[in-house]
């Protein structure tokens, strides 16, 4: 991430300068942007845990603009979303593809949103292997296990059958925000922030 904007806030004690992400965190907004890897996941998990410690009853907003990424990194975010007490609402801004779409669907029921011109894409896990045949078999079995796990969670989150999810994730399956709502990955397409 290149340039990070700063905002200045006037308080009783004078002016205070924040980077924009710290300011958003004050409002319980976490931004998941770009490829999901271990570093990004650790940052998201830390922010979720921090916000739970600040107020375990108040919702957290997870804004997603991501092409996806590493499955285990994404699953660490998913597990933390389920582990913490506050509801995590998810909002797609731009795109939620692959693991990004998976996490979008994992928001609290009734609190999964997308902006109108965002795109959502689901597909099966990607992976590669090299080495001895037995090593390739081990990796292949693990990818198939993760595929089954993610399809099962997507089916539960969307209300689609496991068979339908398996069919749709066999290749890249793109949806508009409206189509993602009809599919069950989100609950509402947001036109205006009513805060």
From Swiss-Prot:
GO molecular function, one term: serine-type endopeptidase activity
Primary location group: cytoplasm
SUPFAM superfamilies (alphabetical): ClpP/crotonase
Cellular compartments per GO CC: cytoplasm; endopeptidase Clp complex
Active site: 98, 123
Enzyme's top EC category: hydrolase
CDD domains, A to Z: S14_ClpP_2
UniProt-annotated location(s): Cytoplasm
Chain coiled-coil ranges: none
Reaction equations catalysed: Hydrolysis of proteins to small peptides in the presence of ATP and magnesium. alpha-casein is the usual test substrate. In the absence of ATP, only oligopeptides shorter than five residues are hydrolyzed (such as succinyl-Leu-Tyr-|-NHMec, and Leu-Tyr-Leu-|-Tyr-Trp, in which cleavage of the -Tyr-|-Leu- and -Tyr-|-Trp bonds also occurs)
UniProt keyword terms in alphabetical order: Cytoplasm, Hydrolase, Protease, Serine protease
Pfam families (UniProt xref): CLP_protease (PF00574)
EC number, UniProt record: 3.4.21.92
Gene Ontology BP annotations: protein quality control for misfolded or incompletely synthesized proteins
Keyword Protease: yes
Function field: Cleaves peptides in various proteins in a process that requires ATP hydrolysis. Has a chymotrypsin-like activity. Plays a major role in the degradation of misfolded proteins.
PANTHER family reported in the protein's UniProt record: ATP-DEPENDENT CLP PROTEASE PROTEOLYTIC SUBUNIT
Subunit structure as annotated in this protein's UniProt entry: Fourteen ClpP subunits assemble into 2 heptameric rings which stack back to back to give a disk-like structure with a central cavity, resembling the structure of eukaryotic proteasomes.
Family of the protein in this entry: Belongs to the peptidase S14 family.
Protein name, entry field: ATP-dependent Clp protease proteolytic subunit
